[in-house]
């Protein structure tokens, strides 16, 4: 935000330079980005009196002037201007002078006559043109030889501030004046607000206002009759120009002036155009066309808040007025609007419409609704002062939920301990009073009343920040901590997550990351039925778009998107995993959704179900999860029936793994088989143990036996393994499946499964007879229970 230094001095008596003030304000928390001095572009231009004018001997349109610039001898200047006479005082750019736009002046000959400089016009000095064609003629009592910047008061600095979103009270010249006064320990003066309605007509008799949406927190309207549209006074135009705002006419300029001065946007409607005598504040209609003051027709929708004349939009609330209610040269009656709107809605609407204005940039920060009346009074005062019209009697003010001051109690001893200072409570009170935080001291307690314009002060820590910045951060002594800080370590969950990543990358997988918000269309793509609980989602109020409008309840679609993207780019294989969250809504709206930590693994290309299962078994083993089992799953719509399993850990459901249903693959344009596992990490981590346990190497040899069985295709390998472990007894050390085969030499409807079995006792050597007895028992049980045949 740009604040002209001269304008700032209208409200606070500053006796230091703009640069020094910038340094002081930056140290007190109001960051100064840049200080621009308008006079820096002008160098070596002084006032001079024309003592003699003679015709140029070789040019009819040129004259030769003798100009006194306060030196011992006058200088000679050749010019083509013709609006000056002898004894006139003019700006003179001498040899070596610099003018705006980096124009350098050098002495030289014009048609054979030496010219030692140039006499300047208003345009050449970069000043607003008054309409005079030719040189700038200065008052006759102007001192000779003076720097033109001093004479014309051109040496005005503009200070540019970076205003953070939590300080909307600083989005104005008065707000910066308040900060300046607090920083320098002096008083500041509020602008005059008093006025007397000169027109006895009451606006309440001719206008009605209705707020139909809570996005408008307050709306105030006043009327002005017998309006005189004319140019604003020079001082106002100058202030606006310095702040980067173009002067238009007195009414528009007054509203812009007050917006910059107090930080509260206002708008003036041509009273003739409010034909329904009723202003309505409500959202627009889908596809509604509306032409704004910049003469651009825009399409609005039901999310954009509008100011309407009955059913007809006349302004985009908080953004820009409409061309259909613009104040014109023949306007005789205006309706003044001063309101407060929801900042989030203004920001979203402004972005959607591609229209960001000075007004919207202020409303985006959530302004204080109590500023509305102050700004309206100020506008009425200026209309009266500039004789721009007659303010009507009465005020329409709709303010349903008034914002009130906040009260805080802070212990002064806590404050010093928190800041590491030794500030007296009396000084604390003084610092807070400077910032208009009215403070009473009661013992060691500071009773603070926070004004409504300081919405950022909520906690005692916020008060501490205010005291620290006025006291001076640079004045706070450097001290050692009173306590010993301990370096924070990772949580068990973080260690487990790191372990999972390490295991899966070691298994040849690549980690992927996807958005947690998804499209409603994903459920159809992965064949989730309409009544399935997975479709009960958390909906985002302000989504980036429909494709990102829901919080996901499953990671299956996210992984399918990743596999599809790889497949579409002709990658012959993909091995991916992602650790993320799914969001399960609570039945009670007051309870936050459950955030479930999830691991999803996806792959295609020269892999099968057993590859995926092997990765999971390795993961379970590395996490030291003791009891895991699998059960057939045939009902999940996303997976191929008969080629899917449920994983249980300690009898608790931990996830699904299997081959993806062909119809799902078609929906993602994938022509290869894909395999996915979706696991509940919370269940895995609850049963994991990453502490390393060591045991002595076995002292006695093991007996290894391989077993190849012919079984029906429907027999689960888990059932086979369960029998082996149960019947193996205490001498069984380990059992592993190492082959599953179907094809040549295997009857139809059958499969061959092969296991490696290890027998061992920790305290003695096993005999062949002992091993054979147990091994034969296992084979008989498999034959009797599962119809297995030993190959």
Curated annotation (Swiss-Prot):
It is found in: Cytoplasm. It is an enzyme of class 6 (ligase). The keyword Metal-binding applies. Mg(2+) binds at residues 456, 462, 465-466. Transmembrane segments: none annotated. SMART domains: B3_4, B5, FDX-ACB. Its EC number is 6.1.1.20. Keywords: Aminoacyl-tRNA synthetase, ATP-binding, Cytoplasm, Ligase, Magnesium, Metal-binding, Nucleotide-binding, Protein biosynthesis, RNA-binding, tRNA-binding. InterPro entries: aa-tRNA-synth_II/BPL/LPL, B3/B4_tRNA-bd, DNA-bd_dom_put_sf, Fdx_antiC-bd, Fdx_antiC-bd_sf, NA-bd_OB-fold, Phe-tRNA-ligase_IIc_bsu, Phe-tRNA-ligase_IIc_bsu_bact. GO terms for biological process: phenylalanyl-tRNA aminoacylation. Coiled coil: none annotated. Pfam families: B3_4, B5, FDX-ACB, tRNA_bind, tRNA_synthFbeta. Its cofactor is Mg(2+). PROSITE patterns: B5, FDX_ACB, TRBD. Binds 2 magnesium ions per tetramer. GO terms for molecular function: ATP binding; catalytic activity, acting on a protein; magnesium ion binding; phenylalanine-tRNA ligase activity; transferase activity; tRNA binding. It comes from the Bacteria. Residues 39-149 form the tRNA-binding domain. GO terms for cellular component: phenylalanine-tRNA ligase complex. Residues 403-478 form the B5 domain. Residues 698-791 form the FDX-ACB domain. Belongs to the phenylalanyl-tRNA synthetase beta subunit family. Type 1 subfamily. Tetramer of two alpha and two beta subunits. This is Phenylalanine--tRNA ligase beta subunit. The lineage of its organism: Bacteria, Bacillati, Bacillota, Clostridia, Eubacteriales.
């Amino acid at each position: 935000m740009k604040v002209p230094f001269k304008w700032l001095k209208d409200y606070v008596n500053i006796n230091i330079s703009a640069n020094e003030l910038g340094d002081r304000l930056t140290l007190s928390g109001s960051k100064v980005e840049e200080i621009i001095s308008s006079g820096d572009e002008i160098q070596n231009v002084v006032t001079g009196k024309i003592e003699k004018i003679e015709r140029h001997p070789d040019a009819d349109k040129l004259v030769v002037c003798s100009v006194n610039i306060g030196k011992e001898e006058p200088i000679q200047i050749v010019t083509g201007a013709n609006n000056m006479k002898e004894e006139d005082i003019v700006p003179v750019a001498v040899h070596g002078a610099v003018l705006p736009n980096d124009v350098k002046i050098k002495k030289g000959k014009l048609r054979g006559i030496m010219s030692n400089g140039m006499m300047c016009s208003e345009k050449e000095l970069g000043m607003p043109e008054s309409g005079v064609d030719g040189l700038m003629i200065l008052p006759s009592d102007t001192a000779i030889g003076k720097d033109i910047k001093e004479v014309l008061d051109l040496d005005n600095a503009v200070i540019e501030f970076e205003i953070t979103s939590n300080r909307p009270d600083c989005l104005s010249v008065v707000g910066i004046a308040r900060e300046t006064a607090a920083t320098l320990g002096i008083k500041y003066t509020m602008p005059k607000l008093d006025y007397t309605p000169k027109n006895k007509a009451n606006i309440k008799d001719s206008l009605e206002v209705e707020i139909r949406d809570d996005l408008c927190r307050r709306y105030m309207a006043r009327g002005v009759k017998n309006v005189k549209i004319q140019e604003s006074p020079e001082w106002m135009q100058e202030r606006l120009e310095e702040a980067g705002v173009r002067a238009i006419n007195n009414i528009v300029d007054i509203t812009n002036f007050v917006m910059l001065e107090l930080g509260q946007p206002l708008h003036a409607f041509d009273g003739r155009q409010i034909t329904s005598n009723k202003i309505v504040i409500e959202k627009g209609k889908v596809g509604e066309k509306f032409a704004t003051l910049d003469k651009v027709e825009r399409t609005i929708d039901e999310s954009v808040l509008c100011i309407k004349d009955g059913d007809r939009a006349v302004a985009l609330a908080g953004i820009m007025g409409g061309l259909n209610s613009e104040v014109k040269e023949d306007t005789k009656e205006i309706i003044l609007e001063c309101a407060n709107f929801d900042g989030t809605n203004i920001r979203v609407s402004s972005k959607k419409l591609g229209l960001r204005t000075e007004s919207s940039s202020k409303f985006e920060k959530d302004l204080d609704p109590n500023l509305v009346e102050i700004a309206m009074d100020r506008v009425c005062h200026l209309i009266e002062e500039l004789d721009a019209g007659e303010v009507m009697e009465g005020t329409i003010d709709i303010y349903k939920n008034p914002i009130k001051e906040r009260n805080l109690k802070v212990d002064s001893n806590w404050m010093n301990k928190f800041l590491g200072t030794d500030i007296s409570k009396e000084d604390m009170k003084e610092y807070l009073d400077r910032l208009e935080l009215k403070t009473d001291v009661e013992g060691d307690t500071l009773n603070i009343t926070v004004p409504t314009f300081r919405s950022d002060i909520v906690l005692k820590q916020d008060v501490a920040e205010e005291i620290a910045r006025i006291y001076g951060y640079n004045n706070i002594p450097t001290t050692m901590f009173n306590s010993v800080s301990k370096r924070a370590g990772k949580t068990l969950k973080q260690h487990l997550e790191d372990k999972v990543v390490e295991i899966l990358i070691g298994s040849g997988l690549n980690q992927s990351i996807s958005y947690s918000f998804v499209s409603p269309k994903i459920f159809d793509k992965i064949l989730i039925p309409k009544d399935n609980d997975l479709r009960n989602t958390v909906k985002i109020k302000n989504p980036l778009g429909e494709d990102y409008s829901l919080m996901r309840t499953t990671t299956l679609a996210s992984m399918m998107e990743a596999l599809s993207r790889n497949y579409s780019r002709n990658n012959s294989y993909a091995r991916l995993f992602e650790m993320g969250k799914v969001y399960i809504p609570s039945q009670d709206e007051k309870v936050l959704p459950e955030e479930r930590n999830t691991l999803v693994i996806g792959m295609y290309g020269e892999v099968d179900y057993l590859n995926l299962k092997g990765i999971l078994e390795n993961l379970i083993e590395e996490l030291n999860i003791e009891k895991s089992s699998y059960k057939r799953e045939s009902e999940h719509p996303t997976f191929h029936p008969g080629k899917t399993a449920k994983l249980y850990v300690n009898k608790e459901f931990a996830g699904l793994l299997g081959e993806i249903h062909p119809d799902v693959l078609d929906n993602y344009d994938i022509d290869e088989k894909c395999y996915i596992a979706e696991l509940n990490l919370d269940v895995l981590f609850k049963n994991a143990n990453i502490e390393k346990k060591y045991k002595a190497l076995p002292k006695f040899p093991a007996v290894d036996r391989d077993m190849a069985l012919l079984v029906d295709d429907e027999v689960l390998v888990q059932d086979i393994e369960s029998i082996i472990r149960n019947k193996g007894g205490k001498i069984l050390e380990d059992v592993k499946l190492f082959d599953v085969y179907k094809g040549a030499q295997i009857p139809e409807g059958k499969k061959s499964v092969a296991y490696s079995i290890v027998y061992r006792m920790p305290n003695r050597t096993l005999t062949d007879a002992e091993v054979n007895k147990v091994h034969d028992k296992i084979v008989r049980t498999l034959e009797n229970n599962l119809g297995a045949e030993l190959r």
